[in-house]
């Protein structure tokens, strides 16, 4: 029998911030959020201590403020003369003394720091499991196939899981939640649903196990369905319209005879190929293995960039934002020695009220004359596409740029499928462009070297100094958040 681990670093960003301040992540009330984006900003992480006061994992900052104020109203009623003796961010102190005002820390995100911690923790994983048996699912979550290693741990995956997590705690101060399963799906569900509610040990470690039999016993009637991996609110609502509210309902539907109104055929009619996955998961079955994940190769590759603007931008202002994004992505192509053949744009407009009827946005794709990494060629194509799709008299709140059909520059010649009718013109075009493109590539490479040494804002275009430009700000960000 195979065994898999799903490991989730508990409240990762918040835990890192606590550790950096020599604080206990399980005791301190702390939120990671960028307060410069107003109280509507989404909190990237909340410590377990603060969650214990009824605050969710990814609330908006104003929701934290409201819940804390609500809790303090209740606590104040119990205090002598309805006055707090003091305040505290410590769960232990707040539990011990109900006359203390509930307080919490709000700290800005530091994405590069979290990446560094994640890399350190990955090195801990490698002490126990080979890289070919690890799949990095996100910055704070991994899957492992631990089957080949269990002979060293009394054939007990729980012992191995406990050993790994205790090493992480001792090395970094960060704890984790672990799901153990006989397939990848069961490991993930054991972690997401069972382990997070299981009693913790002295290090805050929670571990849960599922096989197909236990899954059907413990989770077949669990609600809501959105707690299960790969079932979002949209799928859950569509299942509810069919009268399916639990995994047991889906399994029963899959086993129904053809003459019944609700059967497997009805599921496939509603969900297409997705129904196969729903039915498998209803029975706790997952056919995907770690080897299949490692051997998977996407037919098409792409790179993209997207940003939500902090206010409604005019068309001219948005045009600059779009060019900056294309420049940044083209520099990534040069850095990684890649080329692209297609470019797409997506714009989301600012809503103007119910009384004004207008489209939600615009999008389009343009094919390039040839595979390229040239910023000039890509900006020219993007500008042409922008002019084609933009509506007059609109304001824009979101811009997305994507390069499609991305492949190594070394394969560029092999990728060109030339016909008898375009060979001559393309050859003439290439003769006039080769040296120009080579100069541009050398310049871009030199600029990348300067930015690597002195920072991304070491060299900027003059347009990036305009007050509505976002280039400087985004150069100080990773994934849309401060480095």
State each model region's role.
Residues 1-283, 290, 426-483:
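Gly/Gly-Pro- and Ser/Thr-rich, intrinsically disordered tail segments characteristic of DNA damage-repair
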Residues 10, 37, 350-352, 406-408:
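Short, glycine-/Ser/Thr-/acidic-enriched flexible segments
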Residues 143, 367, 400:
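Short aromatic/hydrophobic contact patches that present stacked aromatics
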Residues 6, 227, 235-395:
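DNA-contacting surface of Y-family translesion DNA polymerases
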Residues 182-185, 280-283, 339-350, 395-407, ...:
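A glycine-rich phosphate-binding loop feature that marks nucleotide/adenosyl-phosphate handling sites
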Residues 355-358, 411-415, 472:
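Short conserved micro-motifs at the rims of enzyme active sites and ligand-binding pockets
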Residues 384, 388-449:
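C-terminal hydrophobic structural anchor segments
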